[in-house]
């Protein structure tokens, strides 16, 4: 397993059920028009969706919390109702979407709550067993009621049975805040979310664009080395194309409404698979052309409800480095081994630890998947056998170990360890089989990353597809001259840029891998009148050596320049003053005559107060060794 440390906090479902009932009692008492629509568990507690005529905002949370406290102190008895009771049956006649709920009677009134995942749960019999309820968030959510869209209020909450559980929760929330990619993205000027541009449509700022380009450059190089061709396809596609693929019928609610052009309907594409299939079909293929590999940096659009949008994690416009491989059945194992190698290599490059590899299989509800029992059995067995061959024990590379050892020799550069890989020298990746997570067209291998907050995220995927090539009548000529249908492998090495960058920001708390930083070094002359000329020459030297450098030639005091550099989490902060200028041999930097340029610098690391002095030549040598890939 990886070395990640997560904060121990276990959600207590019994107390959250009781607290959801206490909130309903408090709301009914204080808001006569209160009408419950939904109550559901959430990652850290639960939420309720309801309607009230009054306008409710975050300003009302303190008032509602006090009323909940009165309900808890009031010691209301809670009686569990049987599902087959006449009272519950009567409610379910009009509330069919509550069929999986649990029902209770309190003071002769019937209330409902979510049914916990745990079995043999012991429900609270009185509200006074609740120690504390915290309302964490309030917002709006749209709901379709009798074919009308109505605006509901959603309150998220967490409940506790002890001070210890609340303290663990508080610790977790503080860590969540410190790792919130939205806050980090704003501080580092990575991206912008402006509702005037539209909810769920992120705007990449200059630093974010730089970061994306760094990731893109690496991926293009890797995909080229593994024999992929880059293609480019339109962001619109005909509705009939997505109807043929099945994406329209199966995921209609995740698509934007069709656009009518010249009496034909078009969709903002939600994925590139159909376009890439058309690329494959554009010319005759034989077995000699397989495997046929293509990739694309594709702009995609998928509909998400406004309540489901979360920073870069859940958006409506996204960019995916999407790739597909068309191959014979005999190619499958070789290709998957190759793609697995690409994933592990890529994650290592970006300092991401894969924690678990899932074999995602179909569930017993076979009507959700394409109907071919033999292919499903064959493909699932095939992936299972391939996974057994993978040895998921990883260790640091020789270069990374040497990098650590080199830094240890230079105590004044200890601050740079923050930008090293953080995992142990070696760890083992867990393997798991998960039913019900297959795509409708075939089984898949999902690579899972566990955040420092204990949340699982699918970071990479390899998906087998026997269906779409048939639907689009893809074919190739085999060795014996017969016509065969190829197998399609869908491959996502990092998922979307948006999700991947949100993971990077959260994982590192904004201390991105050194090689990805928009600004690795900042140079700050104390006084432009006396120190700027040397600062400019130093900047040229670092840029010549491949570093991303910023010169702060503003007229601000040095103390303010340092504060700005600290806020931007810039690792190396170089200060040019009288002493440094005096050390300069007054020769300008010339890349053709680099040896003639010489001088000293003073520098401090992010988070450090001490300043160190060194020669430019020595500092460049150390940094080149530290930052090499």
Language model: regions and residue ranges:
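Auxiliary tRNA-acceptor-end handling modules of aminoacyl-tRNA synthetases
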Residues: 2-15, 24-26, 31, 35-43, ...
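A short, contiguous, amphipathic alpha-helix enriched in charged residues
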Residues: 16-28, 378-389, 542-544
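Metal-dependent nuclease catalytic cores in nucleic-acid-processing enzymes
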Residues: 19-29, 494, 498-508, 572-573
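A structural preference for short, hydrophobic beta-strand core positions in alpha/beta folds
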Residues: 38, 80-82, 232-233, 396, ...
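A short, glycine/Asx- and small/polar-enriched loop/turn
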Residues: 42-46, 440-444, 566-569
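Structured aminoacyl-transfer and RNA-binding surfaces used for tRNA recognition/handling
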Residues: 56-63, 206-507, 511-518, 524-537
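Residue patterns forming the tRNA-binding/recognition surfaces of aminoacyl-tRNA synthetases
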Residues: 180-182, 205-214, 578, 605, ...
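C-terminal structured "cap/appendage" subdomains that terminate the fold
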Residues: 539-622
């Amino acid at each position: 397993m990886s070395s990640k440390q997560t904060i121990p906090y276990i959600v207590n479902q019994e107390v959250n059920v009781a607290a959801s009932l206490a909130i309903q009692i408090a709301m009914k008492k204080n808001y006569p028009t209160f009408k419950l629509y939904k109550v559901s568990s959430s990652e850290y507690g639960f939420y309720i969706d309801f309607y009230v005529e009054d306008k409710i905002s975050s300003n009302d949370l303190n008032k509602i919390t006090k009323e909940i406290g009165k309900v808890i102190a009031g010691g209301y008895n809670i009686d569990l109702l049987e599902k087959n009771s006449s009272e519950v049956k009567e409610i379910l006649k009009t509330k069919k979407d509550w069929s999986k709920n649990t029902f209770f009677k309190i003071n002769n009134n019937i209330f409902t709550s979510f049914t916990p995942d745990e079995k043999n749960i012991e429900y609270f019999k009185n509200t006074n067993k609740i120690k504390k309820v915290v309302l964490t968030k309030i917002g709006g959510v749209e709901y379709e009621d009798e074919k009308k869209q109505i605006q509901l209020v959603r309150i998220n909450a967490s409940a506790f049975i002890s001070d210890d559980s609340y303290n663990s929760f508080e610790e977790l929330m503080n860590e969540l805040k410190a790792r919130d990619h939205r806050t980090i993205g704003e501080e580092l000027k990575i991206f912008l979310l402006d509702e005037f541009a539209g909810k769920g449509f992120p705007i990449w700022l200059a630093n974010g664009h730089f970061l994306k380009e760094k990731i893109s450059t690496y991926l293009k190089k890797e995909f080229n080395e593994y024999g992929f061709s880059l293609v480019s396809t339109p962001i619109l596609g005909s509705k009939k194309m997505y109807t043929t693929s099945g994406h329209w019928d199966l995921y209609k609610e995740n698509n934007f409404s069709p656009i009518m052009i010249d009496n034909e309907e078009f969709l903002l594409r939600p994925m590139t698979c159909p376009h890439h299939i058309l690329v494959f079909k554009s010319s005759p293929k034989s077995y000699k052309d397989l495997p046929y590999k293509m990739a694309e940096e594709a702009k995609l659009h998928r509909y998400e409800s406004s309540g489901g949008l979360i920073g870069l994690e859940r958006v409506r416009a996204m960019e995916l480095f999407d790739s597909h491989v068309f191959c014979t059945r005999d190619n499958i194992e070789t290709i998957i081994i190759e793609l697995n190698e690409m994933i592990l290599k890529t994650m290592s490059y970006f300092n991401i630890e894969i924690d678990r590899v899932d074999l995602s299989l179909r569930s017993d509800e076979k009507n959700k998947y394409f109907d071919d029992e033999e292919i499903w059995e064959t493909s699932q067995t095939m992936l299972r056998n391939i996974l057994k061959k993978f040895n998921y024990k990883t260790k640091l590379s020789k270069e990374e170990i040497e990098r650590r050892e080199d830094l240890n020799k230079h105590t004044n550069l200890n601050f740079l360890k923050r930008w090293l890989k953080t995992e142990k020298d070696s760890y083992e990746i867990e393997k798991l089989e998960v039913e019900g997570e297959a795509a409708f067209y075939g089984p898949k291998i999902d690579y899972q990353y566990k955040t420092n907050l204990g949340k699982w995220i699918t970071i990479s995927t390899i998906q087998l597809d026997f269906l779409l090539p048939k639907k689009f009548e893809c074919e190739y000529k085999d060795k014996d001259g017969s016509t065969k249908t190829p197998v399609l492998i869908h491959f996502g090495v990092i998922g979307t840029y948006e999700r991947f960058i949100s993971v990077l920001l959260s994982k590192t708390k904004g201390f991105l891998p050194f090689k990805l930083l928009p600004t690795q070094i900042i140079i700050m002359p104390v006084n432009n009148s006396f120190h700027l000329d040397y600062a400019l020459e130093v900047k040229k030297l670092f840029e010549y050596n491949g570093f991303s450098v910023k010169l702060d030639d503003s007229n601000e005091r040095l103390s303010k320049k340092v504060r700005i550099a600290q806020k931007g989490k810039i690792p190396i902060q170089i200060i040019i003053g009288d002493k440094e200028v005096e050390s300069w041999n007054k020769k300008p930097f010339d890349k053709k005559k680099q040896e003639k340029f010489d001088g000293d610098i003073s520098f401090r690391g992010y988070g450090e107060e001490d300043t160190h002095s060194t020669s430019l030549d020595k500092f460049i040598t150390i940094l080149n060794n530290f930052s090499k890939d």
